[in-house]
UniProtKB/Swiss-Prot annotation:
Molecular functions (GO terms): translation elongation factor activity
PANTHER family registered for this protein in UniProt: ELONGATION FACTOR TS (PTHR11741), ELONGATION FACTOR TS, MITOCHONDRIAL (PTHR11741:SF0)
SUPFAM superfamilies found in the cross-reference section: Elongation factor Ts (EF-Ts), dimerisation domain, UBA-like
Pfam families found in the cross-reference section: EF_TS
Family: Belongs to the EF-Ts family.
Disulfide cysteine pairs (residue numbers): none
InterPro entries according to UniProt: EF-Ts_dimer_sf, Transl_elong_EFTs/EF1B, Transl_elong_EFTs/EF1B_dimer, Transl_elong_Ts_CS, UBA-like_sf
GO cellular component: cytoplasm
Name assigned to this protein: Elongation factor Ts
Compartmental location: Cytoplasm
Keywords assigned: Cytoplasm, Elongation factor, Protein biosynthesis
Region feature (Involved in Mg(2+) ion dislocation from EF-Tu): 82-85
Chain's role: Associates with the EF-Tu.GDP complex and induces the exchange of GDP to GTP. It remains bound to the aminoacyl-tRNA.EF-Tu.GTP complex up to the GTP hydrolysis stage on the ribosome.
Length: 288
């Protein structure tokens, strides 16, 4: 068996980020061949990934990346098994690298991201293989759960990540004055994170959801002994309150409860003499 030096072990650890004892074992198993040792560790990571495939990976973080010109952005959720790992530099650095890669390649799905290659500084593997390697390194199941890419050629993208990175939101505003509208976009991203709307306006709320809510309100009213002739009016009133909870434009603005988001947008349009419209948003909360 070849003599394994401390320097060889350190070099392998620096290259892979895997613990010293595992690196020593890999070098011993491969006769001190650095390339074979790296491959050995990758295979070990893949085996561990397969072993932990059924484990529950409900911890992790929300990662958002927005381009310097605010014309594109991406939000993703990367999961692991424990909060301890989720807060570590290795995991957060890996999530950030995935976010950078997804933004750079304008990646629109997790499947597409898994087929891309990591930067050389992150090992140069395909993302799918890098996740298996990361599983071996951290000893936990690592799972790329979801991803959404924004293209805002007609305006700007802005985002907000709550401290702890368990909640994040990203929003696309169409506007002809993106620089002036940027502070409002930031506020609205925070609004989406805090108030959890499901759609931009009430016309986008799915009809099946409206029907479900209406039936619940109807049965509640009848159960409270309300007369049949008044029930429809009661249902409409409660639907209005429902819209104020789940529709972004009808919510109270996070920085002024006296104004709806729609009124804030109208005010900005007049003040800036600019077109400003919310096109879409995505809100991710860890584990949803």
């Amino acid at each position: 068996m070849s003599q394994i030096s401390a320097k060889d072990v350190k070099d392998l650890r620096d290259t892979t980020g895997i613990g010293m004892m595992d690196c020593k074992k890999a070098l011993e198993e491969t006769g001190g061949d650095m390339e074979k040792a790296i491959e050995y560790l990758r295979k070990k990571g893949a085996a561990l990934a397969a072993k932990r495939a059924e484990k529950d990976a409900s911890e992790g973080m929300i990662c958002i990346r927005v381009s310097a010109d605010r014309k594109s952005g991406v939000i993703l959720e990367l999961n692991c098994e424990t909060d301890f790992v989720a807060r570590g530099e290795v995991f957060t650095g890996f999530a950030g690298a995935l976010g950078d890669l997804a933004l750079e390649n304008r990646t629109v799905s997790t499947d597409a991201l898994l087929k891309l290659r990591m930067a050389d500084a992150m090992g140069g593997e395909l993302v799918d293989d890098a996740i298996k390697t990361m599983t071996g390194k951290l000893g936990e199941k690592i799972d790329l759960k979801r991803l959404f890419f924004f293209d805002a050629a007609d305006g700007l993208v802005e985002s907000y990540v709550h401290p702890g990175a368990q909640l994040g939101a990203i929003i696309h505003l169409a506007t002809d004055k993106p620089e002036a509208v940027a502070p409002l976009a930031k506020d609205l991203a925070m609004q989406v994170a805090a108030a959890a709307p499901i759609e931009v306006d009430r016309s986008a709320v799915p009809q099946e959801l409206i029907a479900k809510e209406s039936e619940i309100y109807r049965q509640q009213a009848l159960g409270q002994g309300k007369k049949e002739e008044f029930v429809d009016k009661i249902v409409l009133g409660r639907l209005d309150k429902y819209y104020q909870e789940v529709v972004l434009l009808e919510q109270s603005f996070i920085k002024s409860n006296n104004m709806k988001v729609s009124a804030v947008l109208d005010e900005f349009r007049k003040l800036l003499q600019a077109a400003v419209d919310v096109k879409e948003f995505v809100r991710y909360q860890l584990g949803e």
